[in-house]
Amino acid sequence: MSWRGRSTYRPRPRRYVEPPEMIGPMRPEQFSDEVEPATPEEGEPATQRQDPAAAQEGEDEGASAGQGPKPEADSQEQGHPQTGCECEDGPDGQEMDPPNPEEVKTPEEGEKQSQC
């Protein structure tokens, strides 16, 4: 009893978009602001030309002064209670390889191991 329903796949019609018309040859003068930064005039202060390292130091000082102990770390640990069967990554944060089946000892009938 094999019933084949009608396929719902329908190819979309292709749309052809015409490329924009060329007004004229592009000259480097048209995009010179992107290549060279604009030089400030004599009457304007050069606020954008500050040393980036000095600006970075100012941001770091403000960020470190307002921070106290991080409460997020404590709340994350309390949010996940340990059930006694926690499979964790290795000490480097990488997954551990599965044990070699030849080295694994099978539990005796009286002993049971918890499996994750």
UniProtKB/Swiss-Prot annotation:
It holds the Pfam family GAGE. Disulfide bonds: none annotated. Not expressed in normal tissues, except in testis, but expressed by a large proportion of tumors of various histological origins. Residues 102-116 have a biased composition (Basic and acidic residues). SMART domains: GAGE. Residues 31-44, 86-95 have a biased composition (Acidic residues). Residues 1-116 are annotated as: Disordered. It comes from the Eukaryota. Belongs to the GAGE family. This gene belongs to a family of genes organized in clustered repeats. They have a high degree of predicted sequence identity, but differ by scattered single nucleotide substitution. Their sequences contain either the antigenic peptide YYWPRPRRY or YRPRPRRY which is recognized by cytotoxic T-cells. This is G antigen 2D. The gene is GAGE2D.
